[in-house]
Structures are given as structure tokens and as C-alpha cells.
Amino acid sequence: MEGVLYKWTNYLSGWQPRWFLLCGGILSYYDSPEDAWKGCKGSIQMAVCEIQVHSVDNTRMDLIIPGEQYFYLKARSVAERQRWLVALGSAKACLTDSRTQKEKEFAENTENLKTKMSELRLYCDLLVQQVDKTKEVTTTGVSNSEEGIDVGTLLKSTCNTFLKTLEECMQIANAAFTSELLYRTPPGSPQLAMLKSSKMKHPIIPIHNSLERQMELSTCENGSLNMEINGEEEILMKNKNSLYLKSAEIDCSISSEENTDDNITVQGEIRKEDGMENLKNHDNNLTQSGSDSSCSPECLWEEGKEVIPTFFSTMNTSFSDIELLEDSGIPTEAFLASCYAVVPVLDKLGPTVFAPVKMDLVGNIKKVNQKYITNKEEFTTLQKIVLHEVEADVAQVRNSATEALLWLKRGLKFLKGFLTEVKNGEKDIQTALNNAYGKTLRQHHGWVVRGVFALALRAAPSYEDFVAALTVKEGDHQKEAFSIGMQRDLSLYLPAMEKQLAILDTLYEVHGLESDEVV
């Protein structure tokens, strides 16, 4: 639904007419329909807001997220307000109904998992006691052999029960936290949902060229937002893809700074006024890099040599694409999209055994995104979100965006450490994972979580299987050009990721937000 409503702005301007659009469970507003291509001035998520009808004014309605966001609106007539109330209520009900069943199942399985982990702690205490008892019997000699046999039998039984309970924990995790549930993007982030769906296609569908991938992405976006690509935008995408292919052949140091995400607004609308200027800047970068290259010899591509795409080069949004804002500000939307893009690496390591790690990573991304969508105009950078919660004295409250970002950066450090091990030539995936875990997450985990991770390590794939999973086209991993391409892509990806994590580390250290809590 769309139309004009009056929105309360401030005491100076009072009620001002704005053009509102209800689409995909999100109510957004603009100055006018003609200015919609510039992007919305604000939006509110219907699934999490309250709809209140004014007790006196029969043309007024209020949309409220308590403590976060307030929309005071007036319709031009009672009948028009009624139409909006029906549309807003229906959007809220549909979103709630579709999520209720899955959320209920998710909550039940989470509680079951917590219960099993409590049992694990109990069995651990019993094991410690029984080991001490066994030591006592051993030191007293063999005079009471019958008691020694009983203690040994009891210890063996407890060990078996402990392992069985641990196995049940993994079964619950496998049954509860499937890929579909983990990838479920919170309503209100259409761009992230679009990016997520295209990432899932890459390991399965061979993509012959970059243009074909972009058209597939556009189709996905249009399916959810009811848009059409016009001729000008199609030409723009073709030109940009030809530039990308040319840049890969000339110089590996060129990153795709002119990512198509820069031309997509929060509501999925394409910004047109900067398109040709971006192409000119990109072309200038290509000309300059052709004469001033600083790549290593093995990274350079001779003209005509095969360029094989990898998982990292086909990402729609990558950490290497992110341009920092003023004062090293990390753009929130681009960062979260890049986090979603790297999550499939855990699937390639084992979608079942790494489900708890993946669940934690995606859950933290969603928590930060939920904070972001409450006020996209204000929370343009991660720093602004953290500082807002610091000033409100809620930064260290459980489930806050600041806490979620803390665990998110820890999880990203683990992935970065693992990929660094692989890039440096480690051929044993178990060793690479263990080294990365020991340097990053291990210090923050208790013995139960460490045990689960140790169990997951045993199911890690071989180096050949993991590398094969990073290909876009089946069989590419057997080519020498693919190994060179992996080195090239990781040499761009990992330093950019490290730089942004270092900025977040500094932010948390300055404000004393790091935590020694063990989970």
C-alpha cells in the first residue's frame, strides 16, 4: 500500500505531508513519489512495532518501538486511516504468524540443548570425583581389589554416559539448527536477504561469467521488490562487468570498489545519478593501475592467461569492497552484508558439526542488524551503534548490539585465522582449525564448548575436499590457475578484514567493553 500521510516532524514544522510505502513488512517514507529514487528518509519494521489508535483524534495513529522509534501519523480522513490500519495490521500479523511456529521449535530445541549441556556439567563433576576416588584406591595398594574393580566400573559407566550425552547434544544441534533456519534473515533487511540467497547458489550452480551472475542477482531482487530493470541500468551492469574482467587480467591489486551495492538503496532502489561517474572513476583506476603496479610476480596475469573465479572473488559484498567513512567509520550495512557472505565457509567445513558455531555467528549478525534497522539514518556506522549504547548505559546489557558485535568480531577473527593458515600453506584442515581456535575463541569458551569443538574437528574435511568446495565451477580446483587465484583473492580479502577488526578492537578497548566472561 502507498499514499500520503501527515507525519509529525517537530514543534517548528508541525505536521508535514510525506509519501509512505508499505512493502515487505516495512513502512518507509519519502518527501514525494518523485523523490523515491533518492532512497527513503526513514522506515519502521512492522513486525516489532506497536500500532496505537489515538483516543481523541480519529484520523491519527502512532507506530511505536518502545524506547527506540516513534512515528506519529495522521490521515486525511477517517476512512483513509482505517485503510492504513487494516494494511499495517495485516502486514504485522502475516509476519508474526509465519515466524511463530519456527521460533517456537527453535526455542524448544534451544531449551533441550541447554538441558543436555547441564547434564554434561553434572557428568563432568562426577568424572572428577570418580577419578579422585580411583587415585585413592590405587595409592592404598591392591588389598581391596574388589573395591578397585567397582570404582573402575563406575568410572567407565560415567564416561560412556558423558559421551552419549555429548552425542545427543550434537544430534539436537543437527536437527534444530538447519541451514534454512540459520540463514533466515530478519525482516527489514531486503538487501541482506537478497545477498544471502545469491550466496547459497554459488557452490551449486556453475556461473559462466560475471554478467550472468549479476542478472541472476537482479532477478532475485526484483522477485522480492516487484521492480523492473530498465535499459539504462542493464547497460550499466554490462559495462561494470566488462571492467571487472579487464581489471582481473591487468592487475590483481584492483578491488571492486565500485560494487553494485553502492547503487542500491535500503529499499532496493537504484541510485542513478552517480552511475556514470562511478564508471569513469573505475576506468581511471584501471588506467593508473596498468602503469603503476606493485603486485608480486606470481600475482600478475599475462594477457590471455585463464582467470578462474573463486568463492571469494564471486562474493557480492566483501570486506575488501568496504570503503571506510569519516574517522574510520565502518558502514553498518556493508559490514553486515560482508559477514553474511563469509558464513558459507562454515558450511564447506561441515554444515552439521559446525552448526553451533554458525548459529552463534548468524545470531550475532541478526542482533546487530535489528538495532540498525530501528534507525538506519543514525546508525550508519558500527561505531555509532556502540557509542549510542554506551551513552544509554546499555552496552554491557545481555543481548545488546554491543555484546553481539563483540562476539561477532571474535567469530570473524577465528575465520580469519583459519583462512590465514590455509593461505600460508597449511594442508591439514584440522591443524589449521585448531591453531585458529587456540589463538581466538578458546580463551572465551568453557570446557563444554571446547569439547564440542574438539568433536567437530574430527569431522573436518580433507584439504582437497575443502578447496574443491571453494570453486565456482566443478573441477576448477585441479587447475594451477585456481591456486594462484586463491592466493590473489585471499591477499585482498584477509588484510581488509583484519583492518576492520583492528578498528573494532580499538573501539572496545578505549571504552572498556571487552569481556573476560567464559561461555
Swiss-Prot record:
Where does this one sit in the cell? Golgi apparatus, trans-Golgi network membrane; Membrane
Primary localization class, coarse: Golgi
Q: Please list the disulfide bridges.
A: none
| Residues of the PH domain | 1-93
| Molecular-function GO term, any one | glycolipid transfer activity
- Taxonomically, the superkingdom here is Eukaryota
Asked whether the UniProt record includes Zinc among its keywords, one would answer no
A GO BP annotation: protein transport
Q: Where is this region: Glycolipid transfer protein homology domain?
A: 310-519
Q: Which residues carry this modification: Phosphoserine?
A: S145
**SUPFAM superfamilies named in the record:** Glycolipid transfer protein, GLTP, PH domain-like
What positions are modified (Phosphothreonine)?
A: T139, T153
Q: How does it sit in the membrane?
A: Peripheral membrane protein
GO CC terms, sorted:
cytosol; Golgi apparatus; Golgi membrane; nucleoplasm; trans-Golgi network
- Name the organs or tissues of expression: Expressed in kidney cell lines.
- Description of its domains: The PH domain of FAPPS binds the small GTPase ARF1 and phosphatidylinositol-4-phosphate (PtdIns4P) with high selectivity, and is required for recruitment of FAPPs to the trans-Golgi network (TGN).
Q: Extract the PANTHER family matched here.
A: GLYCOLIPID TRANSFER PROTEIN-RELATED, PLECKSTRIN HOMOLOGY DOMAIN-CONTAINING FAMILY A MEMBER 8
Q: How does it assemble?
A: Homodimer. Interacts with ARF1; the interaction together with phosphatidylinositol 4-phosphate binding is required for FAPP2 GlcCer transfer ability.
Functional note: Cargo transport protein that is required for apical transport from the Golgi complex. Transports AQP2 from the trans-Golgi network (TGN) to sites of AQP2 phosphorylation. Mediates the non-vesicular transport of glucosylceramide (GlcCer) from the trans-Golgi network (TGN) to the plasma membrane and plays a pivotal role in the synthesis of complex glycosphingolipids. Binding of both phosphatidylinositol 4-phosphate (PIP) and ARF1 are essential for the GlcCer transfer ability.
Name of the protein in its database record: Pleckstrin homology domain-containing family A member 8
